[in-house]
């Protein structure tokens, strides 16, 4: 029997929210707001929260709390929620990341996870004095990073000799509580990203897309993973606008786009499209994104979780039917909308899942 679809939310630990727009956002990046949000999300049925990693300002993100630190703070404020801390190879070494995350796992009863971000913002790397590798080299480094994490977390006297990282007879103690290790997430949509996920990652995040577009990615990565004898779960980005009527929801979307900051949207679009264009296939997560799509950082409008609770629940169950395991959601007004989602959307999703299971059992 298939598992219920899981839900995660983007932690707003970076100022400016998740849309590049001057629309009012009743969301704050400060720690008090985020602690309360984590508690609301936990009560509302969310299993995961994903913290963001940024080092420099840009596209409205003038202030940024560091991801591992805020992840620990949110875990301390909750009891069941898992928090996924975003980490960049380069600024982090696998030795440091393994030690930090193992310690947090011990302190929180096994509730930390990691999102290994290969990097998309060239200016940020230059600003902090980190080398900017070519596209596929970034993913090669990330794969070594993940292999090193797994080795450190699961072996004593770990040795590893890669092109980017080396370990000689290293033993980490204490190791994480989670067995075999904390869950490892990654994102991307290039061939290099999918290939890496099919070999080493537990979870693969993809940008928002149509059902058909998501299915093509799911089928491709699952086939690659099967060929490698590996299992990987799929998470999809979605910007959720749930309102009592579809007209209200569509009006909110229209206002977000109408109040978009053109300079910031175009600057962000140029940065991410250049990063993707450096891949051998000349594409990436945002290759086909329009101006309207780019107003939301991760193409979240494309997933179309916009409408009434019933409409959104039906679309979520349709995504589950094509192999999606998790919805990574963003909101305009996080606290109130996460609570609304938990009260009005999530119960409908569970009802529809139960109906589908019953129908399969009868058939």
Swiss-Prot record:
GO BP: any one term: alkanesulfonate catabolic process
Transmembrane segments: none
Catalytic activity: dimethyl sulfone + FMNH2 + O2 = methanesulfinate + FMN + formaldehyde + H2O + 2 H(+)
Domain of life: Bacteria
InterPro entries (alphabetical): DMSO2_SphG, Luciferase-like_dom, Luciferase-like_sf, SsuD_RutA_monooxygenase
Keyword Ribosomal protein included in the entry's annotation: no
This protein's name: FMNH(2)-dependent dimethylsulfone monooxygenase
Species of provenance: Pseudomonas putida
Gene for this chain: sfnG
């Amino acid at each position: 029997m298939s598992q219920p679809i899981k839900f995660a939310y983007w932690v707003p630990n970076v100022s400016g929210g998740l849309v590049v727009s001057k629309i009012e956002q009743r969301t704050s990046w400060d720690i008090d707001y985020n602690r309360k949000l984590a508690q609301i999300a936990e009560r509302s049925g969310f299993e995961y929260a994903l913290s963001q990693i940024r080092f420099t300002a840009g596209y409205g993100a003038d202030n940024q709390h560091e991801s591992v630190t805020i992840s620990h703070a949110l875990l301390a404020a909750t009891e069941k929620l898992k928090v996924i801390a975003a980490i960049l190879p380069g600024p982090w070494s696998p030795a440091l990341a393994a030690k930090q995350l193992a310690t947090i796992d011990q302190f929180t009863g096994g509730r930390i996870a990691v999102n290994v971000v290969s990097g998309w913002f060239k200016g940020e790397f230059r600003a902090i004095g980190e080398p900017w590798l070519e596209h596929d080299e970034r993913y090669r480094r990330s794969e070594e990073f993940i292999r090193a994490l797994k080795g450190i977390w699961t072996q004593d006297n770990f040795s590893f000799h890669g092109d980017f990282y080396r370990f000689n007879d290293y033993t980490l103690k204490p190791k994480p509580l989670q067995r075999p290790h904390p869950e490892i997430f990654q994102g991307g949509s290039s061939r290099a990203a999918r290939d890496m996920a099919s070999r080493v990652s537990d979870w693969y995040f993809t940008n928002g897309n149509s059902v058909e577009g998501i299915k093509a990615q799911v089928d491709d990565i699952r086939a690659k993973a099967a060929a490698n004898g590996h299992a990987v779960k799929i998470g999809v980005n979605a910007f959720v606008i749930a309102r009592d009527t579809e007209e209200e929801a569509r009006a909110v979307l229209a206002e977000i786009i109408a109040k978009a900051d053109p300079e910031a949207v175009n600057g962000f679009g140029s940065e991410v499209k250049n990063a993707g264009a450096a891949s051998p296939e000349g594409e990436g997560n945002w290759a086909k994104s329009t101006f309207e799509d780019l107003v939301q950082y991760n193409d979240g409008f494309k997933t179309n979780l916009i409408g009434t609770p019933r409409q959104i629940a039906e679309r979520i169950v349709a995504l589950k039917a094509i192999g999606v395991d998790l919805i990574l959601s963003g909101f305009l007004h996080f606290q109130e909308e996460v609570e609304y989602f938990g009260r009005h959307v999530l119960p409908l999703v569970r009802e529809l899942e139960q109906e589908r299971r019953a129908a399969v059992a009868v058939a």
